[in-house]
Amino acid sequence: MITIKKGLELPITGGPEQVIHNGPAINHVATLGEEYIGLRPTMKIKVGDKVQKGQVLFEDKKNLGVKYTALASGTILEINRGAKRVLQSVVIAVEGDDSVAFSKHDAGSLATLDAQLVRTNLIDSGLWTALRTRPFSKVPAVDATAAGIFVTAIDTQPLAADPAVVIAEHKDDFANGLTLLAKLTEGKVFLCKAPGADIPAANAQVEEFAGIHPAGLVGTHIHNLLPASAKRSVWHIGYQDVIAIGQLFTQGVLNTERVFAIGGPKAKKPRLVRSRLGASLVELMADETQAGDVRVISGSVLNGRTAAGVHAYAGRYHQQITVLEEGREQEFFGWAMPGGDKFSITRSFLSHLSPSRLFNMTTSTGGSERAMVPIGNYERVVPLDVLPTLLLRDLLSGDFDSAVTLGALELDEEDLALCTFVCPGKYDYGSYLRDCLDTIEREG
């Protein structure tokens, strides 16, 4: 067991009840282009077309052979594009449950399936896009091989669901998914979970992680078990997608069910809700928010994104929906107040005298962007064997060669989310990291 001692357990109100409830009917789903880094789509459909669940919507010009499929049957309602015709979203009005049929196999024969057949079925169904690489956090090439595959069956994000609760309903499917993932690598499949969690392992190598966030991040797991580099690519996948892979091969259909943890200070009934991938959050959250000016976030409070407009749909890789109050109000002489109702990682506020207290946090950053001040905050929340202050400084200054030397290739935006949260300078380090990774990949 690996114990993580550096990090932060965010003391925020609105933790979800760990019981799964059925969500409302969803009439619109969407595939979001921003979820897939570097995507340049070749569209296979147009507005008004009828599609089946699992039918190809578009392929990627820059990653040939990767297919992105419909998350529901129905009619293509919108194809939204932004500046420079960047794909924002493909919206489907849900009608019926017609599905493309994929190859079906007995559970007992999965271990003997040909590796190329497994790969082809995942690509054709669109479930190949559930896999992501380190470095760069992109969908892997269809002919690539991973040095190892990490299954993240632990979640230490604030207000997250307990993976064991979700997996308990689909233990056989999860075990089958692990068996199939082993066909995609010559290395090991690592099942990362919390100590004592009742999660089937099949033939995967079980690794337990204990401690505070980011103990549940795949970046932490990869760093400790099989570090990624320019010469070694590892893949990772979420536990609910492993269940979907198992169901694809034993049932022959694409299962797009997704359990979300709805939580946050402004969530009316924080709990786990069964819905579907790409669900319209306008529909899913219609009766889930308290009155007032609130922001709905797809993903974690630390590194999720605002769900509004053409982006008001659940993210492909998100398993949480967070609701916060918009922090628009100015506080008179706020800097001079003792701060009994404010949280800080430093002992700047009176609230540090109540270490077990939970806070009704808002979207306010508590100030505008200013100079980066290294006062030890970053070292307190980064458990990786890196020099966080030097790495972050290099990202801000654009010294990408030095950033790579310090370990930037191992990281994803979520790995720096705590650094952003505790930063006195209010910098969003995730965006700087993405600029670095894009530049390194482009320039080789």
UniProtKB/Swiss-Prot annotation:
One of its GO terms (molecular function) is oxidoreductase activity, acting on NAD(P)H, quinone or similar compound as acceptor. It catalyses: a ubiquinone + n Na(+)(in) + NADH + H(+) = a ubiquinol + n Na(+)(out) + NAD(+). Keywords: Ion transport, NAD, Sodium, Sodium transport, Translocase, Transport, Ubiquinone. InterPro entries: NqrA, NQRA_2nd, NqrA_C_domain, NQRA_N. The keyword Transcription regulation does not apply. Its EC number is 7.2.1.1. Transmembrane segments: none annotated. It comes from the Bacteria. GO terms for biological process: sodium ion transport. It is an enzyme of class 7 (translocase). Pfam families: NQRA_2nd, NQRA_N, NQRA_SLBB. HAMAP family: NqrA (MF_00425). Belongs to the NqrA family. NQR complex catalyzes the reduction of ubiquinone-1 to ubiquinol by two successive reactions, coupled with the transport of Na(+) ions from the cytoplasm to the periplasm. NqrA to NqrE are probably involved in the second step, the conversion of ubisemiquinone to ubiquinol. PANTHER family: NA(+)-TRANSLOCATING NADH-QUINONE REDUCTASE SUBUNIT A. NCBIfam families: nqrA (TIGR01936), PRK05352.1-2 (NF003759), PRK05352.1-5 (NF003762). Composed of six subunits; NqrA, NqrB, NqrC, NqrD, NqrE and NqrF. This is Na(+)-translocating NADH-quinone reductase subunit A. It comes from Shewanella denitrificans (strain OS217 / ATCC BAA-1090 / DSM 15013).
